């Protein structure tokens, strides 16, 4: 009986020590940004994360538009004043533009770049 009780205590201690590590690893990298008059506010023009990171890009805009994260093929439709998020796991290393689609005439243009490092 003593061995199983000791083993159970050791297991409980080990799980208690590992719990914070599991919680920390699952926390997403969150970036909050806004696009006002066609310009990016609240972030640098390049965001850097590590491959395997959970990422959340939170957006607001003063006009309707669609944002497209190339390489991951994620699109989000933004409405004025309504927060929108792109949530994904950064599985592909490289440099990827987030482009504005449908916010006026002319070619699509990047508002920022996402760099995913191995």
Per-range role (PLM):
Residues 1-4:
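N-terminal secretory signal peptides that target proteins for export/translocation
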Residues 10-20:
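Bacterial N-terminal signal peptides
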Residues 21-25:
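Sec/Tat signal peptide C-region and signal peptidase I cleavage site
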Residues 26-54:
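N-terminal edge beta-strand
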Residues 28-29, 78-118:
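Extracellular/periplasmic metallocenter environments
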Residues 37-47, 69-72, 81-85, 98:
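N-terminal post-signal-peptidase region of extra-cytosolic proteins
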Residues 45-63, 85-91, 96:
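Beta-strand cores of secreted/periplasmic/IMS beta-sandwich domains, seen most often
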Residues 60-80, 109-114:
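Histidine- and aromatic-enriched segments that form or immediately flank copper-ligand environments
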């Amino acid at each position: 009986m003593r061995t199983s009780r000791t083993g159970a205590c050791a297991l409980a201690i080990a799980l208690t020590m590992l719990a914070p590590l599991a919680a920390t690893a699952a926390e997403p990298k969150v970036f909050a940004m806004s696009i006002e008059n066609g310009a990016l506010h609240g972030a640098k023009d390049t965001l850097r994360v590590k491959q395997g990171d959970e990422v959340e890009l939170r957006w607001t805009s003063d006009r309707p538009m669609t944002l497209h994260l190339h390489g991951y093929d994620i699109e989000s439709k933004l409405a004025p004043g309504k927060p929108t998020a792109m949530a994904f796991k950064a599985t592909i290393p490289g440099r990827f533009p987030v482009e504005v689609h449908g916010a006026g005439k002319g070619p699509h243009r990047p508002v920022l770049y996402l760099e995913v490092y191995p």
